Amino acid sequence: MTKQEVTYEAKGQILIIHLPKELDHHSSRNLKYETDLLFAENYINKVIFDFSKTEFMDSSGVGILLNRYKQMARSGGKVNLYGANRQVNSILMMGGIMKLMEHYDTKEEAVFR
């Protein structure tokens, strides 16, 4: 996996998005395009963002997270996240993400709650 590559894992109606090392303008643009396609082709009622490999995130990353949250909220879905390090956690808090999404330490917690 390159530093900008996002990977996806589907578990029924749950989409787990494994974020790259850097969630910046470039990777956020790709993430938006790819998730738009996945949402159009599949019924998804929960999105989980995996931050375990993410070391850097800018405002574009915050923007795409907010966009995906709003999209899921409109359809009655849920968004969780897990694995954020201290630096990314700080950005998520400043961006208001932590007030909107449930955050967990592990993938298992994020999937089953």
Predicted features and spans:
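STAS-typified acidic loop motif
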Residues: Q4-Y33, F51
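Short, flexible active-site-adjacent loop segments at beta-strand->alpha-helix junctions, enriched
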Residues: K21, N85, K107
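Amphipathic alpha-helical interaction surfaces in cytosolic regulatory modules
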Residues: H25-L100
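Short acidic-hydrophobic, aromatic-tinged amphipathic segments that line or gate anion-handling sites
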Residues: E102-T106
